[in-house]
Amino acid sequence: RIMVSHVWQAITRKKRFEGDSHLDSNLRRCLGLMDITFLALGQMMGAGIYVLTGTVVRNQAGPSIIFSFALAGIAALLSAFSYAEFGARFPRAGSAYTYTYIGFGELWAFIVGWTIPLEYMIGNAAVARSWSAYFDNMLDNYIKNTTIGALGELSEPGGFFSTYPDILSFLLICLCACVIAVGPKVSANVNSSFVVLNIVVIFIVIVSGICYADFNNWTGTTSDGRSMFFPFGLTGTLTGAATCFFSYIGFEVLATAGEEVKSPHRTIPVATFLSIGVIMTLYILVSSTLTLMVPYDQVHTTAPFAEAFSARGCTTVMYIISIGALIGLTNNLVTGVFALPRAVYAMADDGLIFKWLAHVTSSTKVPLNAIVIFTLLNAIIALIFDIEALVEFLSIGTLFAYSFVSGSVLVLRYQSAPIDGDGKRMDNGGELSSWIPARNFWESLPAGTSISLGVAALIGSFFWLAFTFRTGFYEHWYGQISIGFNGLLIVLVMAFILGHQQNSLETSFKVPFVPFLPCLSLLVNVFMMAYLTTATWIRLFVWMGVGLLIYFSYGIRHSKEAKKLTTIADIRMSSTFPNKNNRITKT
């Protein structure tokens, strides 16, 4: 019984900061506003423009893709609000992992943190193989044919392994790692140069494409009576929005670089919204250009812009687009390789995975061990695995992290916070209104527990709601009754959360309309997760199982937070801010 109690206290302990200790870092703070804005743009700008646009236009949304990109951008913005608040309040490497550690405790933080390196490795491998395929296609598949001729095939098409070892993608990831290892400022300058070149290419595409615009591609009806603008109906536009959402994945790299940003309290929120605003504008402009140039049913799915200009005889612009695609994919890869070791460093620095991975070089101030080990592993994944078999896993890992960050905002907002410099006096954050049933019981729980339970209830309700729509359960009378009960539960939980008092902590940015906006973000993320395949969920649980073995055999005993909490009372009452019981008395 004592052992169970000890384990429970260990897995629920939260990351705490004393005074300004959240600003302490072994890394070098050298990145400014434009550096990290371009870092986020580099992560978001690439495959979303040059590859994804054609697929969504042709198969899902038609010209209404402009609304798909707008809706997806708004959905991404909901999560970005939460990241911006945490980035301003706690500018630490680790991103969602660190924020979950603060809000929900060590075990959930480890689970989220364990998915982040895999997310980056799969994403980087997919981008590297796309870069390799795009470049090889310009050479008429010379590299592929030569490799197969020399080494043979690894497996049959459609298997878990690639049909041939992609040596070019392996070398490309290793090259990016060398750039990253030189230092954050050098890699930021390289990335910024590529972003500027890519934006120039995109403007060339837009200006040149408008010259061939035909508004008949947007108006009128198709031969079978469908709207030219909404050929797949509203459902198609919404389906396209779900696909386009993943074009915005990348703004969280700002939070990953939090320990290397100058003036992070102001810079991170501004860069977050600036990058999303710029990329949303570019997505809408380029998709408008494409659908005005070519009827939606004639858009090429693999190389939409290059083929559109090729059909018009504009070979010069076609080659510029091909170069722009390589630049955009290089952006994706540089920023992805930049973020990967920093996500690992954050967990290692907290003692949850092997401490030697947190080693920072004295000269360049980068986590060199994490760079070497994980980029090498990343390069091997790109070399031999079929990325299409793994890429859907990228979606669930990202949405999983986004959900916990939104929930962590709620937990943190309803905790008491210091009202003086030394943290000896606390405000009334987290106090319950008198009308809340069993008020004394809820207030006797450790800080944030009641809100955490409320968030868990909301997530469960949202998943059930998504299940009823995905399976068609809502079409039956008993399904409609369950929706009614579920809706009532959501209302009651929201009322319970609203019955808590928010803290008065002042920061450079706070999520507006709490708790409604974070809860809306949770709803969107949960619905998208619920529509992923069963196989994807199985892979997630298998990966989590491997991570939990590492945590319970190593991390739980070497956690840095365990050394701060020396008594059961400390552990029980732990919160993000110390001295939570020294609240001021209202007058």
Q: What do the predicted segments below correspond to?
A:
Residues R1-T587:
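Alpha-helical transmembrane bundle of multi-pass secondary transport proteins
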